[in-house]
From Swiss-Prot:
Function field: Catalyzes the phosphorolysis of diverse nucleosides, yielding D-ribose 1-phosphate and the respective free bases. Can use uridine, adenosine, guanosine, cytidine, thymidine, inosine and xanthosine as substrates. Also catalyzes the reverse reactions.
GO MF, any single term: uridine phosphorylase activity
Protein name, as recorded: Pyrimidine/purine nucleoside phosphorylase
Keywords, in A-Z order: Glycosyltransferase, Transferase
Enzyme class label: transferase
HAMAP family on file: Nucleos_phosphorylase_PpnP
PANTHER family named in the record: PYRIMIDINE/PURINE NUCLEOSIDE PHOSPHORYLASE, PYRIMIDINE_PURINE NUCLEOSIDE PHOSPHORYLASE
A Pfam family matched in the record: Ppnp
Keyword Heme in record: no
Keyword Metal-binding among UniProt keywords: no
Length: 103
């Protein structure tokens, strides 16, 4: 799916790491919340509250989940799962566009 129809968008952006990650929250008709964003070239560490599925929709990244020793590469059309109350490191050499699915 290349777009979401019939959604509400929170106008104010979520800006993290001095602008290296910017996203917008979208709310689907059924109340489901997602964020749609971009991570600019950088190496960042994110903490999670709820479980997340990160769906890549453009670019690529390397990811290391908390407790793992190896980095894995993900690109356009690929997803990775992050447990709740955890963290992950992400490294991008190019803009990485994503949709974050919660729960």
């Amino acid at each position: 799916m290349s777009q979401y129809d019939n959604v509400s968008v929170v106008k104010k952006a979520n800006v993290y790491f001095d602008g290296k990650c910017v996203s917008h929250t979208v709310v689907l008709a059924d109340g489901t919340k997602k964020t749609v964003g971009v991570i600019l070239p950088s190496s960042l560490t994110f903490n999670t509250g709820a479980p997340e599925i990160m769906e890549g929709v453009g670019g690529s990244c390397r990811v290391k989940l908390k407790g793992e020793s190896e980095w894995k590469t993900y690109g356009d059309g690929q997803s990775f799962n992050v447990p709740g109350n955890s963290s992950f490191e992400i490294a991008c050499d190019e803009p990485y566009h994503y949709v974050c699915h919660f729960g």
